[in-house]
């Protein structure tokens, strides 16, 4: 029996070491197109550059969190003209699970007077895998990321987490900043693009599905802001009319968000032409200029930005 236990222990240690070596070789050598159950390629939306920058920032008036709608939709330069300092904590496909994480990690340090929680309803129905991989691939690995990874529970995520931990320590592989040509990173976490890509004007009708896990995380994140006495507003940034109209339960989604706090759906406030969009889901710079001006005006009338400006 002792011999069996010893052999089993030795075999387990050998397999574990072999697995680690295999993941390191796999992540270093295998091209992204051939990767299976592994993804450490990231490069979407300058996530690494954004979170490297925020480590050097303190005390801003406004923080924005959310998906690519956030980092492509809120330009710090426009807010600065109104006397508002801001930082954008958006990341690619950021679901409520990750929004709660990034706010929990940075809001105490940034000490914002207001948080804009940008919501893209589609991401309330995902498992959070894509966004989690993006954060890990950008060097964000701590006990909370590990705990969240176990909650999502995906083999691809575990492999990426293992490689990411080694890469943070030994710098095996350099991570890209962005895959998208024509994108420019602007200090404060924003990604600027003047491009306008052709996109489909007709889409299949569908419903937005909200998972209980994502909704629970969203509510928990808002409650954590309340517990720190940080004011927040929930914002749905505009996306193309054809895309928005394809969802049949938009009013139901509005009721969900309205029940959780001060909420504005700018798909119903603005009616921007397709030329103002980078693609069917994101504004380009011309659209951002109009959207941000309207947002500042709307929230100023509710007393938010007026108070911030008076405090500066």
Predicted segments, located by residue:
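Residue-level recognition of beta-strand->loop/alpha-helix junctions
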Residues: 90, 236, 265-267
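A structural signal for isolated positions on well-ordered beta-strands in alpha/beta enzyme cores
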Residues: 63, 116, 231-233
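Secreted/periplasmic serine-hydrolase-like ester/acetyl group-modifying domain
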Residues: 132-230
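Hydrophobic membrane-insertion alpha-helices, especially the h-region
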Residues: 6-28
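Membrane-embedded segments
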Residues: 65, 69-149
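C-terminal regions of proteins
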Residues: 247-312
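Membrane/wall-proximal cationic-aromatic binding patches
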Residues: 22, 26-87, 91, 95-102
């Amino acid at each position: 029996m002792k011999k069996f236990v010893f052999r089993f222990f030795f075999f387990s240690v050998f397999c574990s070491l072999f697995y680690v070596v295999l993941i390191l070789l796999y992540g270093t050598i295998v091209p992204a197109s051939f990767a299976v159950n592994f993804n450490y390629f990231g490069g979407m939306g300058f996530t690494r550059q954004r979170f490297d920058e925020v480590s050097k920032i303190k005390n801003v008036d406004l923080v924005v969190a959310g998906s690519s709608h956030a980092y492509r939709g809120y330009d710090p330069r426009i807010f600065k003209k109104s006397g508002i300092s801001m930082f954008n904590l958006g990341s690619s496909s950021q679901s409520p699970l990750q929004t709660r994480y990034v706010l929990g990690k940075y809001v105490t340090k940034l000490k914002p007077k207001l948080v804009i929680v940008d919501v893209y309803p589609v991401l309330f129905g995902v498992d959070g895998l894509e966004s989690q991989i993006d954060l890990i691939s950008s060097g964000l690995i701590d006990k909370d990321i590990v705990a969240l990874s176990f909650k999502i529970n995906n083999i691809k995520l575990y492999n990426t987490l293992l490689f990411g931990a080694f890469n943070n320590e030994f710098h095996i592989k350099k991570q890209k900043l962005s895959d998208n040509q024509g994108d420019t990173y602007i200090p404060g976490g924003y990604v600027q693009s003047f491009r306008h890509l052709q996109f489909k004007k007709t889409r299949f009708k569908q419903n937005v599905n909200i998972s209980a896990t994502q909704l629970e995380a969203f509510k928990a994140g808002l409650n954590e802001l309340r517990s720190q006495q940080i004011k927040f507003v929930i914002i749905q940034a505009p996306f193309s009319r054809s895309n928005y109209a394809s969802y049949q339960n938009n009013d139901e989604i509005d009721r969900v968000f309205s029940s959780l706090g001060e909420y504005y759906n700018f798909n119903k406030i603005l009616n921007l032409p397709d030329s103002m969009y980078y693609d069917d889901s994101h504004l380009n710079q011309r659209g951002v200029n109009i959207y941000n001006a309207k947002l500042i005006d709307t929230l100023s009338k509710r007393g938010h930005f007026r108070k911030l400006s008076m405090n500066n």
